[in-house]
Amino acid sequence: MKKITTLMCAVALWCSAQAQAPALHFGRDGKFRIAQFTDVHLDLGTPYRRAQAEKTIAQMRYILDAEHPDLVVFTGDVVTGKPAAQAWHRVLEPVAERNLPFCVVLGNHDAEQDLTRAEIGRIVTSYAGTLNTLGAGGELADVVLEIAGTKKPAALLYCLDSHDYSTIPSIDGYGWFTQEQVGWYRAPVSYTHLRAH
């Protein structure tokens, strides 16, 4: 009975996430505009860093208002200071205020603060415009976003996390895409709106 209840809860949660995910589509002019913010390094830890963070947030707002993107993508090292939860909410605020769909791919420094990857995942997926879903261990899952054309899917945007650091003791340095991720990317799939790994 526990397995059936767990399965039903998982299916309901997945369906709920699918229902809330905004649809992405090319405009009538044939364009799809993406604003990408990478290596934001938002840090609210000291008065100086908070002042710098406010300049960053103001610049993000300016870009979003000037460009009117169809999608916002955050890639790597978004928050690199404590208190990380406050910084995550602050960096996502300009996107949420504009009701823009967005996706986050973590960098190697995001989980070095006072939040785990799962805690970051819960914050990111708490926003209505997120296209992220939670995967193994509650972390942000790899996703492929379908961008619709007038009659059929016109483009796919893959968002994969290469993780933090090497998981092999004899190899130093940063992480990489796993064989499982590469296999997921290569696998032929029937796409609906978005697929999580």
For every predicted segment, state its role.
Residues 76-93, 112-127:
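Metal-dependent catalytic neighborhoods of phosphoester/phosphodiester hydrolases
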Residues 10-18:
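Hydrophobic h-region of N-terminal signal peptides that target proteins for export
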Residues 43-45, 80-83, 104-115, 165-168:
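Active-site environment of divalent metal-dependent phosphoester hydrolases
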Residues 19-90:
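N-terminal active-site segment of His-dependent metallophosphoesterases
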Residues 25-34, 144-159:
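Beta-strand-turn-beta hairpins that frame and shape the catalytic cleft
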Residues 2-8:
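Sec-dependent signal peptide recognition
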Residues 192-197:
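Conserved small/polar residues in nucleotide/adenosyl-binding loops
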Residues 100, 106-137, 155, 162:
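Active-site neighborhood of divalent metal-dependent phosphoester bond hydrolases
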